[in-house]
Amino acid sequence: IWPDAARRIWEITTEATALVKEIVARRAISCDLTEGYLEAGWRARDEADARAYAAHLRDRYGCATIRAVPAEEMRARIASPAYVGGLEDRAAGHLHPLNYALGLARAAAEAGARLHERSEAVALEPDGARTARGRVRAEWTLLACNGYLDDLDRAAAGRIMPINNFIAATEPLGERARALIPGNECVSDTRFVLDYF
């Protein structure tokens, strides 16, 4: 059963990526959606691992959007000598998360959803959620939280490990950013505690 489950998980992730792109286009959400992702290897073995993984994805899942990137090409695509090859995924990418969330909220409101900002859910109930100051009744409830669920959903909280995440924001870097990552891909590396930018 495991190969079938793995294939279904793969299909769900590719469907989710396509859905985000479709929603952005259909709802005209201005969120700087940009295709292209690089996973930059930093250990000598990462280049060979990337080749093997890209071949596995191609052979097992028919994935034609992910390919291995040799070390010399990776150094040209990320202006750093630190990386030794890796992967490129042309179907993945990045966007401005706040602008995307605002666009989704606008689209939901236009479709008739009622949004309840600053209404922290303290308990999920069969017909909605209880907040610190009232109740929200709903046929469907979507649990979309960070890793700190506490009593909101004990079963999910026991399966999620919160992690530290640090982000620095600057004013737009313009040409300086284009000189560092000419293709404007999003990048993460293969460290255990990874860097991403």
Predicted regions and their residues:
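Active-site substrate-recognition segment that forms the wall
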Residues: 18, 26-34, 121-123, 134-197
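Short, surface-exposed, polar/charged, turn-prone segments marking secondary-structure boundaries
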Residues: 60-61, 66-70, 94-97, 115-117, ...
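A conserved short coil-to-beta-strand element within the FAD-binding core of flavoproteins
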Residues: 68-80, 113-128, 135
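Well-ordered beta-strand positions enriched in small/hydrophobic/aromatic, beta-favoring residues
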Residues: 86-88, 129, 168, 197
